[in-house]
């Protein structure tokens, strides 16, 4: 993370060094009361404001949300328990989400479990808690209320569960994954061994360091998978399960 107090949102996006690779949606950096899909507009990164941001290359959107602070002491008084009351339960729910990413699981069951883990009156999740991703960021979703669609090997799934609260703002652990049965994992290891090794290494990190329940059928596609840094001016502080 390259966020620094006082820099503009344009400078922050430049620090991401997107580099010209094809994008699945525009880059977002929404600071303060800016709409959630806002692009940079010249706002300054100011201590004590909420912020969300994403960069979406084809096949995976990386999005995070938190507060422009270094510790809970710099949060608004009403939000001082942001981690305990909001961000930490969300991280545990994302562990539950990972555990469900197995061939044969019904999409409606994922929706039900996410609504149970993230009660609406506190977390306000309204969009599908996860969806398919491709060249476009949002393709379609088997995860919805009452869905009988079955998760299948080969699905590129976006962990996209968006909470919102009037006091706590938001939090996010959004990255791309692939659901892969044993045949697909064997094919990947044979044809693209370096990719397979990176996926395995990240899954181990998520299990052993963060404490998440990541099945062997879920392949993480980024080195940000599993990371929630609630205090954006001190990203070395990350949450664990």
PLM regions and their residue ranges:
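Active-site neighborhoods and metal-handling regions in enzymes and metal-associated proteins
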Residues: 1-241
